[in-house]
Amino acid sequence: MFSIFQQPSAKVLLLAMSIAFMFPTSAYANTAPLTQSEIDRQIQTVPQWQQEGQTITRTFEFKNFVEAIAFVEQLVEPAEAAQHHPDLAISYNKVTVSLTSHDAGGLTAKDFELAQTISQIGGG
């Protein structure tokens, strides 16, 4: 019995489809590193965030540890949806969020988009 998947062209197509499924193009949207002038413009869209080298950071303060952890839990869904994950430092009632695009070697539009979402979750 002859199978279409035994043909080299079919194997290449199947491989390409598998890769496209595993790595959708939306995961790579907005991943070009920004220039410093672009960063300077973008940082204005996320008040209270600070640039530290190739990272942007912001510390959120809450009434207690429980509220701080509840905030962190709210970050899971948007981070997963964006396929972009912040670095988090928790110190009792404070959560410091840091964003960078490691694969791009610096800050990208994705960092600022996620920073806006995180700011909304954190109350502005």
What is the predicted function of each stretch?
Residues 2-14:
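Bacterial N-terminal signal peptides that target proteins for export
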Residues 25-124:
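Conserved, structured core segments of small domains
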Residues 13-24:
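Bacterial N-terminal signal peptides
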